[in-house]
Amino acid sequence: MGIQHEFDIIINGDIALRNLQLHRGDNYGCKLKIISNDYKKLKFRFIIRPDWSEIDEVKGLTVFANNYAVKVNKVDDTFYYVIYEAVIHLYNKKTEILIYSDDENELFKHYYPYISLNMISKKYKVKEENYSSPYIEHPLIPYRDYESMD
C-alpha cells in the first residue's frame, strides 16, 4: 500500500491545518498564503506522525517565508511523533510560506496542498488539495497533549 505519514501544523495554538501529508509517499509539505494588515509574529508547530512500515528515519523539515529560510527547531522526537517549531514574522500584507520535506518543484505544483489564511477577516480556505485531503480546524481544540502550545 505504501508509506503514509500524518502531518499537521498548529499556528499560535488557535488554527490547525490537518492531513497535509500526501495520500502515499514519504514526503509531506504545503504552501501557505497568509494575509495580514500589520506586523504579526506567528508560532508554528509542525507535527509528523511517522509510518514506520518502510522507513528507518523521518525526513527533516524545511521552511521558507517570502524566499527567506526560517529556522526550524526539533523539540520532541518519539516513536509516535516528531515535533518541530518555528517562529515566522509577517512584515508584508501577503506572506508566502513553503513547508516541505522535499522541495521538488513537481511536488508543489501537483501534490502538496495550497492553503490561504486571511488573518484580517479570519477566513481560512484550502485553495488546492492536490494529492492530499487537508482541512482547517478553527478554533483549535487540542485532543493530544503535544498539540497544546503553552
UniProtKB/Swiss-Prot annotation:
One of its GO terms (biological process) is symbiont-mediated suppression of host innate immune response. Keywords: Early protein, Host-virus interaction, Inhibition of host innate immune response by virus, Viral immunoevasion. Induction: Expressed in the early phase of the viral replicative cycle. InterPro entries: Poxvirus_C7/F8A (IPR004967). It comes from the Viruses. Pfam families: Pox_C7_F8A. Belongs to the orthopoxvirus OPG027 family. Inhibits antiviral activity induced by type I interferons. Does not block signal transduction of IFN, but is important to counteract the host antiviral state induced by a pre-treatment with IFN. This is Interferon antagonist OPG027.
